[in-house]
Each structure stands twice: as C-alpha cells, then as structure tokens.
Amino acid sequence: YELASALSQKQFPKALAIINSLFSTDFYAPLMISAFFRHYWALFRIRRFAEANPQVVKTFLSSRGYKDPAVDGAAYEIGLASGLLQEGEQRKIYPVIIASGIVQAARKFSDEELKTVLRWLLEFDAGVKTGKIEATEHEVQLFCFRIARVSELIRSGTDI
C-alpha cells in the first residue's frame, strides 16, 4: 500500500526507497501488481463518483475537522463507490478514506492517466505471469518510474 500511495502522490524517490526495502525481503511481484491495480482502480472509481456526485466530494474536501458526521457520511459514500469499503464498515472510514489521502490523490490524475496506468498494470502483470518480463528490482523500478511520470509520458507521447 505504501508504494502505491507514494506513486499516486508522484513521490518517486520515496517509491524507490520502498522498492529497495521490498526487495530485501521475500518480495513477490504479483502481489504488488494486485495491490497497485486495486489502488489505481479505486482512484479511477473515485474520479467517476466525484463527477456524478460533486457535492459529496466537496463536502468531504471542505471539512477541516475529524469526527464530523457530514465528512464521515461523505467518506463512507466515497469508500463504497470506490470499492474500498463494504456495507457496514463505517469504522474503517478514517484509516481507509480520510487518513490515506486517496480522494486527494485521485484529483492528481486525469482519466486518461489512470486508464494508461491500468493498461500498463495489465501488460506488466501478463508479462510477469507469462515469463516475458522478469520482475527484478530494476524492472519494478522502471515500471514504477513510468507510473510516477505518467503525466509527462502522455504529454510527450513517449512510452504509451
């Protein structure tokens, strides 16, 4: 989760440190890909929800207080829409939606950027699973660099 979060905040140096740490353990790349896909799919769904329900997201983003019932309600709706929360999981609102900053992260990406990242994830996943890509530390670093720089890569027409 920390790696996906660092990349969604476009903090590549932090992501590199996390990758180095992961590869010093019994790291399994398909689990990372799965976590990334869940994270970026949630970002995409949050953007779709925000487009259809701008007032809910505005309520969520405009609050400054913790334990505000309006914010908790908005966060719960966002969590359900994104697939990060299930019915009855109100107690998870703070760590999953509020503290994680996922709504703010979703605002940092365009739909095109998120679709591109999701496509790259599918390609990387298929490549790893078929043996076309070896999930070495270097390959994972390059892949994460692409994600962190998706905006620039799309603008330049490079590597998409």
What are these regions (language model features)?
Residues 2, 6, 14-160:
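C-terminal alpha-helical interaction modules of replication/initiation AAA+ assemblies
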